[in-house]
A protein has these predicted regions:
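Glycine-rich beta-alpha loop segments
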Residues: 2-206
Length: 207
């Protein structure tokens, strides 16, 4: 990005996602009077006055939307982001977390929302997360990525749950990246196993 913003003349056919251009300008980047953006897309960016003067009529600008999540994220979420505000041992504190607030918003708007702004925000968010996931996976050998989907109804007491966790633990220790749809059951077991990689199997049993 920084090397791109040092260019003079037209910057063409680029998409900028969740970029704070005030930070770039504070570093002296993107301020050249001869720089013009053409056929570019700006998604959820912070646009300065100087930046707006460089916009061409061929550009598209998507402003941030009034929803409790960022529709234009350019990275995946971390556990710390999702559970900020939650305190272990205090179950009610989960209601202070980003994860809870967004889920409540989802329920309030409806699983199948009728508000076009909400459906657009969700679709753009899914698109952004897909991009971030592809960026992450591009750093891995595709033959070293193992995905587990389904098995929502598998209970933690089921022997198959334990088997999946052990398989995931073993594969993670052998350098594989374990991915899932993020749901309960088999998918939860997948991440439990990956989390327990490098620890004795007895620790997994206790968990």
């Amino acid at each position: 990005l920084r090397s791109l913003l040092k260019k003079r003349g037209y910057i063409r056919r680029c998409t900028f996602q969740n970029i704070d251009f005030s930070v770039m300008h504070a570093e002296g980047l993107g301020l050249d009077a001869g720089t013009i953006y053409k056929d570019c897309i700006f998604m959820g960016c912070v646009m300065t006055k100087e930046m707006k003067s460089k916009i061409n009529k061929t550009d598209l600008i998507f402003s941030k939307m009034d929803v409790p999540y960022n529709s234009f994220r350019n990275t995946l979420y971390t556990p710390e982001m999702l559970y900020e505000g939650y305190q272990i041992g205090t179950p009610d504190s989960y209601k202070e977390s980003f994860d809870y607030k967004v889920y409540q918003h989802y329920l309030d708007k409806g699983k199948v929302a009728t508000d076009i702004k909400e459906t657009l925000a969700r679709t753009l968010h899914d698109h952004s997360i897909s991009n971030a996931l592809h960026d992450l996976l591009s750093h891995y050998d595709e033959k070293k990525v193992v995905g587990v989907m389904g098995g929502h109804g598998l209970s933690r007491s089921d022997e198959t749950y334990k088997k999946i966790a052990l398989i995931s633990k073993d594969l993670t220790e052998r350098g594989y990246l374990m991915v899932s749809g993020g749901g309960p059951g088999a998918m939860e077991a997948t991440h439990l196993g990956a989390w327990m990689a490098g620890r004795p199997a007895t620790d997994l049993n206790e968990a």
